[in-house]
Amino acid sequence: MSKRVFNFYPGPCTLPLPVLQQAQKELLDFEGCGMSVMEISHRSQRFEAILAETLSLAKKLIGAPDDFCVLLIAGGAHQQFAMTALNLLADGGSAGIVNSGLWAKRALEEAQRVGKMVELWRAPDGKCTTLPDLKTLTVPKNLRYVHLTSNETVDGLQFPELPDLGVPLVLDVSSDYYTRPLPWDYCDIVYGGVQKNLAPSGMALVFVRKQCLREHTNLARFFCYKHHADANSLLNTPPTWQIYILHLVLKWIEQQGGVAHFAALAQKRSAKLYDFIDNNDFYRNDVEKKYRSKINVVMRTPSDALDTQFWQEAETHALVGLKGHSAVGGLRASLYNAMEMAGVEALIDFMHDFAQRH
């Protein structure tokens, strides 16, 4: 095998090497059945066993209470931007949203097609460097829910806490899923695309409070959470390969020590990188410190030209995916669960060398 690189892309994400090796081992012959897991029927006992354990592990590891169901739905977070509103605003009413960046804005745009959305806070156009203090946010009590994007990958922003706002929360945790505990007591829906921390792209992992599962006769069955729950995530032929990899990743998360382990690792990785950025004159991070993301670290060199030279040269040192989002430029290192400390250390070594030469 050729040397693996350190993958800092924002998604699809770097996956744990033991998971990839297990998938490689079983690729042509899963559990001696003579077929790949990509070929076996989703109605077979083998796949139903994978699905059952995946759903069970997903719920157990994230600490979701019994009054939540867990769903695996083909598509991604963009689809959930609409589905959350389609299900929770089907009977009218309005919802709030904290428009904290590009992904919250996308969620707002989709939800507005369905019902009335109230912007409780709006990020400035372009580069955003701060977030609102959620504890002091004015939230009308008549809102059906408030939508929050827990971590904004583009600007490197993350809410350090997700407090009770007095109305139920709908959380998009796509980029920090399974990196920290979640406030289940006041959530109605928690969702995320799996491609950041958990599996290949093409699927969303969704937790819905059971009391929110209702039949909506004016809604296509595929877009109704109740139908997915009633079908045990088998409403249509599911993305079996993504579910299989998710199953392996969840087992790996459990073996490593669960969410508590990865919360500590996220703090350790990001702190090391931010400390290096803050203690030299070549790199800078403009995000207000208390809102800095532990998952997506953004930074800049003294010029756009050097930013480009940095990520291009980094690729020749087995450090890939460091180019910032096209909307804001700069540089970005995505530190998802499978990113080892060795990757951060290698990045810092390169940053030091690059700064010395420029």
Curated annotation (Swiss-Prot):
Q: Where does pyridoxal 5'-phosphate bind?
A: W103, T153, D172, Q195, N236, T237
- Please tell me one Gene Ontology term that the record gives under cellular component: cytoplasm
Protein function: Catalyzes the reversible conversion of 3-phosphohydroxypyruvate to phosphoserine and of 3-hydroxy-2-oxo-4-phosphonooxybutanoate to phosphohydroxythreonine.
**Record Pfam families:** Aminotran_5
Reactions this protein catalyses:
O-phospho-L-serine + 2-oxoglutarate = 3-phosphooxypyruvate + L-glutamate; 4-(phosphooxy)-L-threonine + 2-oxoglutarate = (R)-3-hydroxy-2-oxo-4-phosphooxybutanoate + L-glutamate
Say which domain of life the source belongs to.
Bacteria
Family membership: Belongs to the class-V pyridoxal-phosphate-dependent aminotransferase family. SerC subfamily.
Q: Keyword Secreted: yes or no? A: no
Q: Which HAMAP family match?
A: SerC_aminotrans_5
Q: Which InterPro entries match?
A: Aminotrans_V_dom, Pser_aminoTfrase, PyrdxlP-dep_Trfase, PyrdxlP-dep_Trfase_major, PyrdxlP-dep_Trfase_small
Q: Tell me which residues bind L-glutamate.
A: R43
Q: Where is the major localization of this protein?
A: cytoplasm
* UniProt subcellular location: Cytoplasm
Q: Which organism is it from?
A: Dichelobacter nodosus (strain VCS1703A)
GO terms for biological process? L-serine biosynthetic process; pyridoxine biosynthetic process
Sites bearing N6-(pyridoxal phosphate)lysine, chain numbering = K196
Q: How does it assemble?
A: Homodimer.
Keyword set includes Amino-acid biosynthesis = yes
Listed Gene3D superfamilies:
Aspartate Aminotransferase, domain 1 (3.90.1150.10), Type I PLP-dependent aspartate aminotransferase-like (Major domain) (3.40.640.10)
- List the protein's name: Phosphoserine aminotransferase
Kindly list the GO molecular function terms attached to this UniProt entry: O-phospho-L-serine:2-oxoglutarate aminotransferase activity; pyridoxal phosphate binding
List the cysteine pairs that form cystine: none
